[in-house]
């Protein structure tokens, strides 16, 4: 094997390693996969997202406006109510059918707080 071929092989191996390690945290699911033993499903999943979102907002200092904050909390609660309703519908949820999403990441697999906060609705200053 020549030096350039060896270098190319090592470079490709390193690239594969980097790609696999950076994308390895994404979970994929089959629709018939069973829940993870430490997974959180249904209403407890929606409550976990709500708690994670509230924690993230408090760590970021909130919006700083009482009036805007109340409006944001109402919007967030409406979003989380919708999330709970989807969790109750279970298999009818488009999040499950896609093979990736909150049910795949946190019910059929085990997720962490960072993955939960990815599902928080966006907080904007201008609403109110």
From Swiss-Prot:
<feature type="disulfide bond" description="Interchain (between B and A chains)">
    <location>
        <begin position="53"/>
        <end position="120"/>
    </location>
</feature>
<feature type="disulfide bond">
    <location>
        <begin position="106"/>
        <end position="111"/>
    </location>
</feature>
<keyword id="KW-0165">Cleavage on pair of basic residues</keyword>
<feature type="propeptide" description="C peptide">
    <location>
        <begin position="59"/>
        <end position="89"/>
    </location>
</feature>
<keyword id="KW-0800">Toxin</keyword>
<feature type="signal peptide">
    <location>
        <begin position="1"/>
        <end position="24"/>
    </location>
</feature>
<feature type="disulfide bond" description="Interchain (between B and A chains)">
    <location>
        <begin position="41"/>
        <end position="107"/>
    </location>
</feature>
<comment type="subunit">
    <text>Heterodimer of A and B chains; disulfide-linked.</text>
</comment>
<feature type="modified residue" description="Serine amide">
    <location>
        <position position="127"/>
    </location>
</feature>
<dbReference type="GO" id="GO:0005576">
    <property type="term" value="C:extracellular region"/>
</dbReference>
<keyword id="KW-0964">Secreted</keyword>
<dbReference type="GO" id="GO:0090729">
    <property type="term" value="F:toxin activity"/>
</dbReference>
<keyword id="KW-0027">Amidation</keyword>
<keyword id="KW-0372">Hormone</keyword>
<keyword id="KW-0732">Signal</keyword>
<dbReference type="InterPro" id="IPR036438">
    <property type="entry name" value="Insulin-like_sf"/>
</dbReference>
<keyword id="KW-1015">Disulfide bond</keyword>
<comment type="similarity">
    <text>Belongs to the insulin family.</text>
</comment>
<dbReference type="InterPro" id="IPR016724">
    <property type="entry name" value="Insulin-rel_pep"/>
</dbReference>
<comment type="function">
    <text>This venom insulin facilitates prey capture by rapidly inducing hypoglycemic shock. Intraperitoneal injection of this peptide into zebrafish lowers blood glucose with the same potency than human insulin. In vivo, when applied to water, this peptide reduces overall locomotor activity of zebrafish larvae, observed as a significant decrease in the percentage of time spent swimming and movement frequency.</text>
</comment>
<dbReference type="Pfam" id="PF00049">
    <property type="entry name" value="Insulin"/>
</dbReference>
<dbReference type="InterPro" id="IPR016179">
    <property type="entry name" value="Insulin-like"/>
</dbReference>
<feature type="modified residue" description="4-carboxyglutamate; partial">
    <location>
        <position position="115"/>
    </location>
</feature>
<protein>
    <recommendedName>
        <fullName>Con-Ins F2</fullName>
    </recommendedName>
</protein>
<dbReference type="InterPro" id="IPR022352">
    <property type="entry name" value="Insulin_family"/>
</dbReference>
<keyword id="KW-0313">Glucose metabolism</keyword>
<dbReference type="InterPro" id="IPR022353">
    <property type="entry name" value="Insulin_CS"/>
</dbReference>
<feature type="disulfide bond">
    <location>
        <begin position="29"/>
        <end position="104"/>
    </location>
</feature>
<keyword id="KW-0301">Gamma-carboxyglutamic acid</keyword>
<dbReference type="GO" id="GO:0006006">
    <property type="term" value="P:glucose metabolic process"/>
</dbReference>
<keyword id="KW-0119">Carbohydrate metabolism</keyword>
<dbReference type="GO" id="GO:0005179">
    <property type="term" value="F:hormone activity"/>
</dbReference>
